[in-house]
């Protein structure tokens, strides 16, 4: 692996445009300290008059903006050299600064909520500049009916350290205390199975290896079913109790409230998948036939179908491809993509001690940088266009909004990146003359829809059902959890797949069940992206304009309302229906090529 000094600068991040020297960095750091001290002076006088109110709100966002910039710089720097202790210390320094700000700004929300919104309206008339922060203030008031008295909030805060430990215990136990028997790989070599290499061996072309991997893993999980049942039950009880304390009807309602999402969006997704369950049954039948199996078991599901595809795309070739793919968008979009590619927004190649993987990251006052570890594979090109989607979303969101309205929610975070991925796949399917490449892309797409919509929706249904039991004062025993999970697998895989008994323990190894109703967002994100791409490719009137307007929304609108700007209404089940119909179309295209 190369050292950074051996990489052409044009393939590396330019972080000097953030801070060119330590003096500039220290100046902003000291400025944050000064502003925190200024903010603290308003602790007891914030709501006394419109000027104090304005100064407090303005200062708080100025501090957050500066901390974001500092935090971005130190974290990007650290990710380029994770062995650098000085950079690690800088990360901790800024993390401590963020904590200091939190400690000294805690009074803002309680101070605001002690007053009726009429007071805010009065202050806005006296000082029109306060209207710049109206959306953020209204978001605070949205939680008023779920906010407790000062005494109750302090009491709840004091026990906060005891809440959320279930996940920490779960991770430690699963990753540190569990050990698995060895299996023999394809060459007869003994290898110790673990949670990390399980995915490697469950995709083996050798069915014996897959079966041994599956049975060995779940044999170990079976031993600890009662422990995992206790952990997930504790987590659900914590959520349910917090929901009741904060005046929500259920744990799921509390979790969805953060994104201003109605529970019917969650339930519509599950209903749509149920309506189109036959599509995934057809996919498993196709896989069974291609693998030439008399019967297909759960340990056969993850083996790739078709021949391996190893076409190389150099980074320069990938740049050319994605520019052609993204020509469907307006001039500003393409101009900014070219700037990203040519102006050192992207750190391209793997180097010694560089963070692995890929991401898009930045702040309001920096480029929306992209980290890659490019190695000339198709997946690397796909990662580039995926992360470019994130970065362009960030560009539009920040460029068309003031800081306080510029951060889009996690609920919509994967939409823009997935739109780009889907556009790449459709472009290559249209322009490639290589049948194997087309089959490879179609297989990737089928797996994307299987894993992101069908599998994540099964998880979402399980999570909804077990939380309902706790909300209604029921008990989650090991047997009940395992039986519920097994029955869901029977439905989601159908009669055409042998649903091995061991799968009843799979829920024990899914960390997302501790993420508080998060997984459905993967499915809604892909559903929304599919609808957007369909509109663009079908040249639907204003499809591109509406999509760009969605990218510009930031946090001015709720996630559901911002997607409506793009022409996608997730309160309507037709969005998920369309995505699942697209899965069926992809399946049929693949069948036509074999």
Regions found by a protein language model. Give the residues of each.
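Post-HExxH zinc-binding segment in Zn-dependent metallohydrolases
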Residues: 408-437, 445-447, 451, 525
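Active-site recognition of the HExxH zinc-binding catalytic motif
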Residues: 247, 375-395, 417, 422, ...
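C-terminal, non-catalytic "cap/extension" segments appended to globular domains
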Residues: 6-7, 20, 112, 136-142, ...
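Short pre-active-site segment immediately N-terminal to the catalytic Zn-binding motif
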Residues: 313, 363-385
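Long, K/E/R/D-enriched contiguous segments that form extended
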Residues: 290-325, 334, 369, 393, ...
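A well-structured
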Residues: 1-308, 319
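Conserved helix-loop functional segments at active or binding sites
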Residues: 324, 328-335, 358-361, 390, ...
């Amino acid at each position: 692996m190369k050292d950074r000094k051996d990489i052409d600068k044009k393939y590396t991040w330019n972080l000097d445009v953030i801070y060119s020297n330590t003096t500039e960095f220290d100046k902003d750091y000291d400025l944050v300290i000064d502003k925190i001290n200024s903010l603290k002076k308003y602790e007891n006088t914030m709501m006394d008059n419109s000027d104090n109110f304005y100064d407090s709100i303005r200062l708080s966002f100025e501090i957050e903006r500066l901390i974001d910039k500092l935090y971005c710089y130190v974290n990007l720097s650290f990710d380029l050299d994770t062995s650098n202790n000085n950079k690690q210390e800088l990360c901790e320094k800024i993390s401590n600064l963020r904590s200091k700000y939190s400690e000294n700004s805690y009074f803002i929300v309680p101070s605001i909520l002690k007053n009726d919104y009429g007071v805010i309206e009065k202050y806005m008339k006296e000082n029109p500049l306060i209207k710049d922060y109206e959306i953020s203030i209204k978001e605070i008031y949205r939680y008023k009916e779920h906010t407790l008295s000062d005494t109750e909030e302090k009491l709840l805060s004091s026990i906060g350290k005891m809440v959320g430990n279930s996940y920490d215990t779960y991770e430690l136990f699963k990753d540190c205390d569990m050990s698995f028997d060895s299996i023999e790989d394809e060459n007869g070599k003994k290898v110790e199975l673990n949670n990390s290499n399980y995915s490697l061996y469950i995709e083996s072309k050798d069915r014996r290896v897959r079966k041994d991997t599956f049975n060995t893993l779940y044999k170990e999980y079976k031993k600890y079913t009662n422990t995992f049942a206790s952990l997930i039950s504790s987590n659900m009880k914590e959520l349910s109790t917090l929901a009741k304390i904060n005046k929500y009807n259920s744990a799921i309602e509390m979790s969805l409230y953060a994104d201003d999402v109605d529970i019917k969006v969650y339930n519509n997704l599950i209903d749509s998948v149920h309506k189109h369950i036959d599509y995934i049954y057809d996919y498993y039948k196709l896989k069974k036939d291609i693998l030439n199996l008399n019967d297909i078991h759960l340990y056969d599901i993850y083996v790739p179908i078709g021949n391996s595809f190893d076409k190389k795309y150099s980074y320069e070739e990938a740049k050319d491809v994605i520019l052609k793919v993204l020509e469907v968008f307006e001039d500003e979009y393409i101009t900014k993509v070219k700037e990203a590619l040519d102006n050192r927004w992207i750190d391209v190649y793997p180097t010694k001690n560089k963070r692995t993987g890929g991401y898009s990251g930045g702040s309001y006052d920096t480029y929306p940088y992209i980290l890659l570890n490019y190695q000339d594979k198709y997946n690397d090109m796909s990662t580039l266009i995926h992360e470019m989607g994130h970065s362009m979303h960030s560009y539009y969101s920040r460029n068309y909004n003031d800081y306080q309205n510029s951060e889009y929610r996690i609920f919509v975070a994967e939409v823009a990146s997935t739109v780009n991925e889907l556009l790449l796949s459709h472009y290559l399917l249209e322009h490639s003359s290589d049948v194997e490449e087309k089959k490879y892309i179609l297989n990737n797409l089928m797996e994307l829809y299987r894993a992101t919509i069908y599998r994540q929706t099964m998880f979402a249904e399980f999570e909804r059902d077990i939380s309902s039991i706790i909300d209604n004062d029921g008990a989650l025993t090991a047997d009940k959890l395992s039986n519920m999970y097994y029955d869901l697998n029977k439905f989601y895989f159908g009669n055409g797949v042998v649903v091995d008994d061991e799968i009843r323990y799979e829920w024990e190894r899914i960390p997302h069940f501790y993420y508080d109703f998060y997984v459905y967002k993967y499915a809604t994100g892909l559903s929304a992206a599919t609808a957007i791409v369909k509109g663009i490719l079908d040249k639907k009137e204003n499809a591109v304009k509406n999509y760009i307007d969605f990218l510009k929304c930031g946090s001015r609108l709720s996630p559901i309302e911002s997607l409506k700007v793009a022409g996608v209404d997730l309160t309507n089940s037709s969005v998920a229906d369309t995505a699942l119909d697209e899965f069926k179309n992809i399946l049929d295209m693949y069948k036509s090529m074999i």
